[in-house]
């Protein structure tokens, strides 16, 4: 937790936002530091980030939730606009990551799954490299 507070100050995140990583991690039984590293890679913690993909889909918010998931999220009462709320977005990201972990294990492939395709994709490796730095800085 101490590390998340230090990073929050460095990246100008609110304490409340860093708490969302802790809360979502606890709820989905995921290391919150993994969620934090994904958010850093995906949006540099920008809750208003929007990325347009070549396939026509859009990634939204802190965790860059892809618009292909909107149909399923609507079943739970969430609309696209809700994904600009950091808490909702971080929980949605944790939910998606948990599904990937259930399919591929808590592994590099599990993290890569969060980004979409697994073949020829270094996403998981890059997130794990960042995670290693996070843990080294905590020592």
Predicted features along the sequence, with ranges:
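Sec-dependent N-terminal signal peptides
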Residues: 3-13
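Catalytic glycan-binding domains that act on GlcNAc-containing polysaccharides
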Residues: 14-139
């Amino acid at each position: 937790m101490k590390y998340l507070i230090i990073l929050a100050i460095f990246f100008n995140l609110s304490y409340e936002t860093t708490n969302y990583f802790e809360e979502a991690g606890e709820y989905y039984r995921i290391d919150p530091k993994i969620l934090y590293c994904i958010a850093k890679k995906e949006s540099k913690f920008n809750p208003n980030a929007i990325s347009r993909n070549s396939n026509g889909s859009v990634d939204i918010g802190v965790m860059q939730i892809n618009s292909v998931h909107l149909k399923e999220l609507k079943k739970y009462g969430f609309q696209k606009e809700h994904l600009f709320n950091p808490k909702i977005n971080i929980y949605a990201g944790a939910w998606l990551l948990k599904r990937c972990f259930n399919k591929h294990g808590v592994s590099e492939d599990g993290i890569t799954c969060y980004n979409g395709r697994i073949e020829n994709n270094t996403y998981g490796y890059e997130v794990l490299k960042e995670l290693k730095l996070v843990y080294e800085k905590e020592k």
